[in-house]
Amino acid sequence: MLTAALILCSSDGAESAKKAPAQWVPLKGCRFMTEEASDGDSFHVKFGQREFIFRLYFVDAPETDEKLTDRIEEQCEYFGVTMKEHRKAAAAAKQFTTEWLKTPFLVTTRWQNALGRSRLPRYYALIETSGHDLAEALVQRGLARAKGTVAILPDGTKAKDHMAKLKQIEAEARAKRVGIWADSKFGGK
């Protein structure tokens, strides 16, 4: 917590995103902020007096911003769904994340720049509530896929091993036809 406080209190705390990723920093006592631009894998968080946007490592949820047509088309192709089915899944992923973050949660970040078009910088993070990983929960419910920026986890788990675990969870969600997979033309392959 002291490390987090030092980073946040320094004049260049947000600037650290321009540098190589640093040590993992746990941010306890974060609060979810309702924002129109939030979706299943990217959202606004209040920590102390500061507001941040965090983007989940390892996963990609259906986009809610309909201006991102190329990404939405690629996601529709991957999941085997129509635009209408994609919109439904994007809303479900956003709702799930909103509900998940109503309970106390832990943000763990290295302040790695996740890019974005917002007024605030966006950083990659891992999010946990009661020891459960949000990214894993999204994939398990068919509300995201295993894809995206990866990192060695704070416990030392290799990124490729964690991604393999998420890919397996995704395959199980697809086979069970949950979430977006319920509407997929690919069936339970």
What are these language model-derived features?
Residues 8-189:
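Small beta-barrel nucleic-acid-binding modules, primarily SNase/OB-fold domains
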Residues 1-7:
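Bacterial N-terminal signal peptides
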